[in-house]
Amino acid sequence: MTQDARARGQNAHFAGAAAEEIAIRAYLARGLTLVKSRWRGPHGEIDLILRDGETVIFAEVKSSTTRDKAAARIKPAQMQRVFNSAGAFLEGEPLGQLTPARLDVVLVWGAGEVEIIENAYGHG
C-alpha cells in the first residue's frame, strides 16, 4: 500500500468517525440512547445501535460533501449486510426477532448537516 493510499484510508476513517459523532448527537437530541457504536456481528459492522424505548434502531451513517453524494453511497448489498447483522444482534435481546426494530440511514454532509431517514428500507 502506498503512502498516499494509506493517508486516504486514514482520512476516510476519521471522516466516518466524525460523521458518526454528528449522527449520535442528532439521535441523543431526539431522546434516544446509544447502545453500541461500530458493533461487529457475524455479517459485518453496524455503525450505530440505539434505543427508543423498547425499539432498537440500527443506523447506517453515510457522509459526503453534499446530501446527494452521501445518499448515493447507500448500496443495496451493504444494507442487506446491515439487515443480516441486525438480526444477529436481536438474537441477544429478550424478545429475540420479535423485538421492535427499525433500520435508519443517516446522511451527513457539508459542515455537519444531518438527515435521519427512519425505517429507510421498510424492515422492522
Curated annotation (Swiss-Prot):
Coiled coil: none annotated. It comes from the Bacteria. One of its GO terms (molecular function) is nucleic acid binding. It holds the Pfam family UPF0102. Belongs to the UPF0102 family. This is UPF0102 protein TM1040_0449.
